[in-house]
């Protein structure tokens, strides 16, 4: 029994110590640092809108995509019910999904004869991407302008305001935040 305790005691103590350090202390320190240094992001990048009565309401997160389907709104990437799809690009199921989404876009805006940007007919890897490409936003400008009765120039200006540049000036592509554009479009009514 003594030999058993000599072997297992350090293992159990090590396990408990590592659990405490890796499961409580380290995450706690990182959370405190993130909350202090990156308050907005650490708390979900919540977007709040002021109401006419002076109160505010939370309308969403700048980091999580919302589903917009009305023609007067900028519409984001195809939702995949909050989960990654992981479909093979050559699979029959993926092909059918893309064809279904293309048909939906043609029904939504039958006068638009331009090629539909890829990100409007495919889901993002996360399934909740808040951004679309500049091409996807440009594809929708005429429809939004027509539906809202505003100039295409106004729509383009709002899109430009909510377009982020490439990371470090060269990584990735500029993206447009769908929720922020739609909130700005709604503020035009006020």
Curated annotation (Swiss-Prot):
Main subcellular localisation: membrane
Highest taxon listed in the record's lineage: Bacteria
Coiled coil: none
Entry GO terms, CC: plasma membrane
Protein name per Swiss-Prot or TrEMBL: Potassium-transporting ATPase KdpC subunit
HAMAP family for this protein: KdpC
Signal peptide (residue range): none
Family of this protein: Belongs to the KdpC family.
KW Protein biosynthesis (keyword) present: no
Function: Part of the high-affinity ATP-driven potassium transport (or Kdp) system, which catalyzes the hydrolysis of ATP coupled with the electrogenic transport of potassium into the cytoplasm. This subunit acts as a catalytic chaperone that increases the ATP-binding affinity of the ATP-hydrolyzing subunit KdpB by the formation of a transient KdpB/KdpC/ATP ternary complex.
Subunit structure: The system is composed of three essential subunits: KdpA, KdpB and KdpC.
Keyword list, A-Z: ATP-binding, Cell membrane, Ion transport, Membrane, Nucleotide-binding, Potassium, Potassium transport, Transmembrane, Transmembrane helix, Transport
Subcellular locations according to the entry: Cell membrane
TM segment ranges: 13-33
Membrane topology summary: Single-pass membrane protein
InterPro entries associated with the record: KdpC
GO molecular function terms noted in the UniProt entry: ATP binding; P-type potassium transmembrane transporter activity
């Amino acid at each position: 029994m003594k030999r058993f305790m000599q072997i297992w005691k350090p293992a159990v103590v090590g396990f408990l110590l590592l659990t405490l350090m890796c499961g409580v202390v380290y995450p706690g320190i990182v959370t405190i640092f993130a909350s202090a240094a990156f308050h907005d992001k650490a708390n979900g990048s919540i977007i709040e809108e002021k109401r006419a009565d002076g109160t505010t309401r939370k309308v969403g997160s700048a980091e999580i995509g919302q589903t917009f389907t009305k023609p007067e709104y900028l519409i984001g990437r195809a939702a995949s019910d909050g989960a990654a799809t992981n479909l093979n690009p050559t699979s029959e199921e993926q092909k059918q999904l893309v064809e279904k989404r293309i048909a939906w876009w043609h029904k939504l805006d039958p006068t638009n004869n331009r090629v539909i940007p890829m990100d409007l007919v495919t889901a993002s890897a996360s399934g909740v991407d808040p951004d679309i490409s500049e091409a996807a936003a440009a594809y929708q400008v005429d429809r939004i302008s027509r539906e809202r009765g505003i100039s295409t120039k106004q729509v383009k200006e709002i899109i430009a305001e909510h377009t982020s540049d490439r990371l470090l000036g060269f990584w990735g592509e500029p993206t447009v935040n769908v929720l922020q554009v739609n909130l700005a479009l709604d503020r035009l009514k006020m």
